[in-house]
């Protein structure tokens, strides 16, 4: 999972 995906989820 990339950092962009992580930020979208949070």
Curated annotation (Swiss-Prot):
Disulfide-bonded cysteines:
none
Tell me the compartments it is located in.
Answer: Virion; Host cytoplasm
* Major location (coarse): virion
Recorded catalytic reaction(s): these are: RNA(n) + a ribonucleoside 5'-triphosphate = RNA(n+1) + diphosphate; a 5'-end (5'-triphosphoguanosine)-adenylyl-adenylyl-cytidylyl-adenosine in mRNA + 2 S-adenosyl-L-methionine = a 5'-end (N(7)-methyl 5'-triphosphoguanosine)-(2'-O-methyladenylyl)-adenylyl-cytidylyl-adenosine in mRNA + 2 S-adenosyl-L-homocysteine + H(+); a 5'-end (5'-triphosphoguanosine)-adenylyl-adenylyl-cytidylyl-adenosine in mRNA + S-adenosyl-L-methionine = a 5'-end (5'-triphosphoguanosine)-(2'-O-methyladenylyl)-adenylyl-cytidylyl-adenosine in mRNA + S-adenosyl-L-homocysteine + H(+); GTP + H2O = GDP + phosphate + H(+)
Q: Which GO terms describe its biological process?
A: 7-methylguanosine mRNA capping; methylation
Answer whether the UniProt record assigns the keyword Nucleotide-binding to this protein: yes
Q: What EC designation does it have?
A: 2.7.7.48, 3.6.1.-, 2.7.7.88, 2.1.1.375
What are the UniProt keywords, alphabetically? ATP-binding, Host cytoplasm, Hydrolase, Methyltransferase, mRNA capping, mRNA processing, Multifunctional enzyme, Nucleotide-binding, Nucleotidyltransferase, RNA-directed RNA polymerase, S-adenosyl-L-methionine, Transferase, Viral RNA replication, Virion
This entry's Gene Ontology molecular function terms read: ATP binding; GTPase activity; methyltransferase activity; RNA-directed RNA polymerase activity
Query: What Gene Ontology cellular-component terms does the record carry?
Result: host cell cytoplasm; virion component
Self-association or partners: how does it assemble? Interacts with the P protein.
Q: What does this protein do?
A: Displays RNA-directed RNA polymerase, mRNA guanylyl transferase, mRNA (guanine-N(7)-)-methyltransferase and poly(A) synthetase activities. The viral mRNA guanylyl transferase displays a different biochemical reaction than the cellular enzyme. The template is composed of the viral RNA tightly encapsidated by the nucleoprotein (N). Functions either as transcriptase or as replicase. The transcriptase synthesizes subsequently the subgenomic RNAs, assuring their capping and polyadenylation by a stuttering mechanism.
Q: Which family does it belong to?
A: Belongs to the paramyxovirus L protein family.
Protein's name according to its UniProt entry: RNA-directed RNA polymerase L
Q: What is the lineage of its organism?
A: Viruses, Riboviria, Orthornavirae, Negarnaviricota, Haploviricotina
Gene name tied to this protein: L
């Amino acid at each position: 999972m990339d950092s962009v995906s992580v930020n979208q989820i949070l």
